[in-house]
Swiss-Prot record:
Plants over-expressing VQ5 display enhanced disease symptoms after infection by the necrotrophic fungal pathogen B.cinerea. GO terms for cellular component: nucleus. This is VQ motif-containing protein 5. Residues 133-150, 157-171 have a biased composition (Polar residues). InterPro entries: VQ_5/9/14. Keywords: Nucleus, Plant defense. A motif (VQ) lies at residues 49-57. One of its GO terms (biological process) is defense response. The gene is VQ5. Residues 61-80, 131-171 are annotated as: Disordered.
Length: 220
């Protein structure tokens, strides 16, 4: 009969299982890693890495960019305070000599033109004023017209003024004469022979009592 040896139960341990093989492989990996040489690792900044790459790739060495770049700021100018009361346009005119000379020339022309016009119209205006003052005063029509050859003065408002005033007024401008001395409506006056028989004398005895006389006159 076959008898088992005494240590037969130990035969199971002689054969290793798969689990044991995996554990054995895991233990052998760190041993291999320890045997390899360690690689040197450098920790650098991103900007330093960029500059390093540029230096290595560029044909010429480039300067390193500044780290602190100043930020853009809006600089506003100070408000302008005008010390004088003259506006800017007037100050610019005063500073420009050409403009100031031209303005002085224009002002002198205006003064000369105003002075010449005043001298021309001063004398006619004085005559006109004196004539109007003379007309405003009441005068006797019998004194203004002197009697000549026994003729009586005509009772008309046309001869209220003196002959000297009429000649002086005729020297004025034509436009003023039209307003100062209005012409009569009709240049002819009709007088009855009965009313003017004593005035004209015995020369009109040959004219009948029913006939009329017409007299025309002109003003020079």
């Amino acid at each position: 009969m076959y008898q088992r040896p005494q240590n037969d139960y130990l035969r199971v341990n002689k054969r290793k299982s798969n689990y044991d093989q995996l554990n054995a492989d895991s233990n052998s990996v760190p041993q291999l890693a320890q045997t390899q040489p360690r690689v040197q690792v450098y920790i650098i900044d991103k900007n330093d890495f960029k500059s390093l790459v540029q230096q290595l790739t560029s044909p010429q060495p480039c300067d390193r960019l500044p780290q602190n770049i100043p930020k853009h700021q809006d600089i506003r100018p100070e408000p302008i305070n005008w010390t004088s009361s003259i506006p800017p346009s007037a100050m610019a005119v005063q500073e420009d000599p050409d403009v100031s000379l031209y303005m002085a020339y224009l002002q002198s022309l205006l003064e000369e033109s105003s002075g010449s016009n005043g001298d021309q119209f001063e004398e006619p205006f004085d005559k006109y004023h004196s004539h109007m003052m003379a007309q405003s005063q009441p005068q006797d029509p019998t004194q203004s017209m002197p009697q000549s050859n026994g003729f009586e003065p005509f009772p008309s408002s046309w001869f209220n003024g003196s002959t000297q005033e009429m000649h002086g007024a005729s020297s004025l401008q034509s436009t003023r004469v039209d307003y100062e001395y209005p012409l009569p409506l009709t240049p002819n006056f009709t007088f009855s022979s009965m009313t003017q028989h004593e005035v004209f004398g015995s020369d009109l005895d040959s004219i009948g009592p029913d006939e009329d006389l017409e007299f025309s006159y002109e003003i020079n």
